[in-house]
């Protein structure tokens, strides 16, 4: 039996952006709005600024690699968990991204020849930064960049946060080898006795 999804945000989005197609999903009373990548910034700004919505808190921001998911139609997803404190409502935004080149520099199987190109990443994995809307996104976007190679355009300080500069790979991608690509062999193991 199909039941319609109701949420106070959905009519507001349809009214504000009549020419944008948003897909909506519900799971355990949580609503997820699938946003086209090119519409992320204007959608996020509207959700924060509209008086009837006021999604003023970004609670969660994460990346997902769907490489081995059986029914996945896209390679990567970026999820934004939003809360409107004044109206006590919650919403998830999801943006799907697909790499243009599966062996782009900085991916396993792709040789890093040009550090600048590797830092910019695959053109298909570029997404507008939401740090101008929710400043708390700054470190979360850096982590997604570092772990998945998704480049956030307009980020004030997009650089690696968990791995070192020049690492050249993105370890949370599903095609990244579980044992790494030589990182363990490059560094001396420090034992408790030798420290």
Residue ranges and their predicted role:
Residues 1-195:
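Terminal low-complexity/charged segments
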């Amino acid at each position: 039996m199909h039941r319609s999804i109701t949420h106070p945000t959905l009519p507001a989005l349809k009214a504000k952006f009549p020419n944008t197609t948003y897909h909506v999903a519900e799971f355990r009373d949580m609503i997820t709005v699938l946003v086209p990548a090119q519409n992320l910034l204007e959608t996020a700004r509207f959700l924060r600024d509209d008086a009837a919505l006021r999604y003023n808190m970004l609670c969660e921001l994460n990346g997902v690699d769907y490489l081995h998911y059986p029914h996945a139609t896209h390679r990567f997803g970026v999820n934004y968990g939003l809360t409107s404190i004044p109206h006590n409502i919650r919403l998830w935004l999801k943006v799907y991204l697909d790499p243009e080149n599966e062996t782009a520099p900085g991916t396993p199987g792709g040789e890093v020849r040009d550090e600048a190109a590797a830092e910019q990443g695959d053109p298909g994995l570029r997404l507008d930064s939401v740090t101008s809307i929710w400043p708390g996104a700054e470190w979360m976007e850096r982590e997604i960049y570092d772990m998945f190679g998704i480049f956030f355009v307009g980020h004030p300080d997009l650089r690696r946060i968990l791995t070192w500069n020049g690492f050249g790979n993105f370890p949370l991608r599903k095609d990244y080898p579980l044992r790494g690509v030589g990182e363990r062999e490059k560094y001396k193991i420090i034992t408790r006795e030798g420290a």
